[in-house]
Amino acid sequence: MATVVPSQRGLNKLYPDARTALEGIVRDGMLLAVGGFGLCGIPEALIQALREIGVRNLTAASNNAGVDGWGLGVLLESRQIKKMISSYVGENAEFERQFLTGELEVEFSPQGTLAERMRAGGAGIPGFYTRTGVGTMI
């Protein structure tokens, strides 16, 4: 029987495509932290693969909601995102429509606060103080 060293599990894996890379690790209802700035540096192949796989009821945390037909806009169009945590959403008509009709839950967070929330969460820090949020719902 082969022994797998835990510190090496999952390292140096190459996948033929984004969909194969996501198999077995995505599920309905999960939270996705999506990188990039505006439409630059977004994981477009992974977003397309999520659409193809068909996971639903996702919470997406990103500095923006994409635009119609691009970025997270693709997952909004297919109704796969149920909640959006973002600092800017102004260029996506589908986002606006879903928000105004109550189909989409939205949480706005200043960009720096959003980045710190992601950093703190990744480090296991349950909360942090920021002067930006004093006196607000944040």
Predicted features and spans:
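Conserved alpha/beta enzyme-core scaffold
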Residues: 1-138
